[in-house]
Amino acid sequence: MENIETILRLAEEKILLVQNLKELQEYKVEFLGKNGIVTGELKKLGSLNEQERKEFGLKINKLKDKIQNIIKAKEEILEEQELNLKLAADKIDLTIPARRYKQGSIHPITQCSEELIQVFSQFGFTIENGPNIENDFHNFTSLNFEDDHPARQMHDTFYLKGQENNKPLLLRTHTSTVQIRAMKNGKPPFRFIAPGRTYRSDSDMTHTPMFHQIEGLVIDKNINMGHLKYVITEFIKSFFENSNIELRFRPSFFPFTEPSAEVDIRMNKNDKWLEVLGCGMVHPNVLKNVGIDSSEYQGFAFGLGVERFAMLKYNIKDLRQFFEGDMRWLKHYNFGSFDIPNLAGGLTK
């Protein structure tokens, strides 16, 4: 009995002084392990009679339970201490400067597109979209292109392997295709713009194989050239934020408009004239191809290159720079996310 009390007291003293879990595990093995002190006491049972074995065995089990409880209590204390130390080590000092966050920016094409759309929205234009891959009817035939028109040639148009109505599919060369689809599927009046990518086999300082267009269409009763001139004039002045900008409409030719015109602008009286867009009254054949009676409805259409307008407004010299991915150039010609116009804000950067 005295030996059991001595073992218990020894265990309490040693475990009380333990400083870490590793040391505690060593004492657990020392007292309760296969060759431990308590296990050694159990070996004495063989030399005792039945009654003594029963009494001694009960005492040994109680000793074992007490030592296990002492170890468990100490283990909980040590685990809490280690957790607190770890939390203290992982503590974040909020006064330390954070890593610099590289914030993205708005590409000038995206910025210019949003500004153009914003201006047209003020004139009541909505937005229509269509597929980039088109068939011959929507891209050429419905728009009054003759079968031998140069625009149909391989050197101007990207043709694909697939076919529709025995004619190859192609990458649309303008977003006028959207106008055809919208007129076929709806009823006049129409007033919308069709922004999107277009594709032509051309590449130099002022042309790229892929570029962005915005084409507009107005179809209604009693529409005339005066309406077209007013919309284009007010649009140009609003986009460039210059009420004194000069415009001139030069006679031109497009298969899908008659009469047709190209619009030139100059910021100041001594500047050279710069061509910025094409426009005209929708050709009666185009209206006929989409099932609209040209004796009842008339309209005008216009088309502009987003990159062209971005170059003029942001003073960018080479069209190819938009697509080169030069980080130095992008850092110079970039816009913050809050610079994108919305219905509540203006256009000034």
Curated annotation (Swiss-Prot):
Q: Which GO terms describe its biological process?
A: phenylalanyl-tRNA aminoacylation
What the record notes about the co-factor is:
Binds 2 magnesium ions per tetramer.
Which residues are listed for Mg(2+) binding in this entry?
Answer: E258
Q: Which Gene3D superfamilies match?
A: Bira Bifunctional Protein, Domain 2
| Catalytic activity, EC | 6.1.1.20
Q: Which CDD domains match?
A: PheRS_alpha_core
Compartments where located? Cytoplasm
The cross-references to InterPro entries, in alphabetical order and at most eight, read: aa-tRNA-synth_II, aa-tRNA-synth_II/BPL/LPL, Phe-tRNA-synth_IIc_asu, Phe-tRNA_ligase_II_N, Phe_tRNA_ligase_alpha1_bac, Phenylalanyl-tRNA_Synthase, tRNA-bd_arm
| Parts of the chain that traverse the membrane | none
Q: Which cofactor does it need?
A: Mg(2+)
Q: Which GO terms describe its cellular component?
A: cytoplasm
* Keywords from the named record: Aminoacyl-tRNA synthetase, ATP-binding, Cytoplasm, Ligase, Magnesium, Metal-binding, Nucleotide-binding, Protein biosynthesis
Show the catalytic activity: tRNA(Phe) + L-phenylalanine + ATP = L-phenylalanyl-tRNA(Phe) + AMP + diphosphate + H(+)
Its family remark reads: Belongs to the class-II aminoacyl-tRNA synthetase family. Phe-tRNA synthetase alpha subunit type 1 subfamily.
**Binding partners and assembly:** Tetramer of two alpha and two beta subunits.
Q: What is this protein called?
A: Phenylalanine--tRNA ligase alpha subunit
Q: Which gene encodes it?
A: pheS
